[in-house]
A protein has these predicted regions:
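Conserved PLP-binding active-site segment in aminotransferase class I/II-type PLP enzymes
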Residues: 1-70, 75, 97
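PLP-dependent aminotransferase-like
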Residues: 70-109
Length: 109
């Protein structure tokens, strides 16, 4: 499988650390977590890498689009220009924050 060669002992250990706690949620269960906060650690390191104060790990690109729109203050009644040829998540994220997707294209033909 393509990409499998990139998974080595270090990656396996990181995953096993989480699996061994039995806690698969981002928040809560601090005692059971045994001091293992992989997502929080990633968010902090990624924010620092990007020169940002905040970063938020999410479950998918769809979630990332929705979070980005909300972070920019996009909401009900706002119009957001989206590509006419794209994956449906682009439009769904706009609709989920209550905004109106406006299809745009780069070629009049």
């Amino acid at each position: 499988m393509a990409g499998a060669e990139l998974i080595g002992n270090e990656e396996m250990k990181e995953v096993m650390d989480v699996l061994e706690t039995g806690v698969f949620m981002r928040y809560g269960f601090d005692k059971e977590r045994q001091g293992i906060f992989k997502v929080k650690q990633f968010e902090e390191e990624f924010a620092q890498y990007c020169g940002s104060t905040y970063a938020l790990g999410v479950t998918s690109g769809s979630s990332a689009l929705k979070v980005a729109l909300a972070a920019m203050g996009v909401g009900p009644g706002d119009e957001v220009i989206v590509p006419a040829f794209t994956f449906v998540a682009t439009w769904e994220a706009v609709l989920e924050v209550g905004a109106i997707p406006v299809m745009g294209d780069i070629d009049a033909t």
